[in-house]
Design a protein with these regions (language model features):
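Long amphipathic alpha-helical coiled-coil/heptad-repeat bundle
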Residues: 1-152
């Protein structure tokens, strides 16, 4: 079963959400290895849209990988050369968090988000609207989603 997202994988939506900014391109420029540059770009755009850091780029939709690789004048196949060691992955995650000015989820965030959503529940019972409200809160606070990762 294909994963569903809150956005469409049609070309226009992918372009709108996953286009690298000038600052993003400048951030990626120092990376000499094509595979690492594409991986870091994917982690960056995915964190911006989905609010999570992705360890395995194959979990990202092909349309997104293709769009981002074109912006870097690379072929998606360069990812086959990626040697994503834990230390390199951690460095990528830290660099992306710093570039986006966000931080990882902390236990205290659960209580704050819960209080925020309780206030919203009185206005809507729509799960989709509550999900959007939670995402808006995370963007405003500058926090990424809590995630289960094997690289702690």
């Amino acid at each position: 079963m294909a994963k569903t997202y809150s956005w469409s994988t049609d070309a226009e939506e992918v372009r709108r959400l996953f286009t690298l900014t000038f600052d993003d391109l400048h951030f990626l420029e120092p990376l000499r290895a094509d595979a690492q540059r594409l991986y870091r770009a994917l982690v960056l755009v995915w964190a911006r849209v989905e609010r999570t850091l992705v360890s395995d780029p194959s979990s990202i939709p092909e349309e997104v990988i293709t769009h981002v690789s074109r912006q870097l004048s690379l072929k998606p196949s360069v990812l086959s050369q990626l040697r994503n060691h834990p230390s390199a992955r951690s460095a990528t995650f830290e660099a992306v968090r710093k570039h986006l000015d966000v931080r990882g989820w902390q236990e205290a965030d659960a209580e704050q988000l819960s209080a925020y959503l309780i206030e919203k529940v009185s206005h809507t019972g729509n799960p989709s609207a509550l999900f959007d409200a939670a995402t808006d809160w995370m963007v405003r606070v500058g926090v990424l989603r809590r995630e289960a990762r094997d690289d702690h």
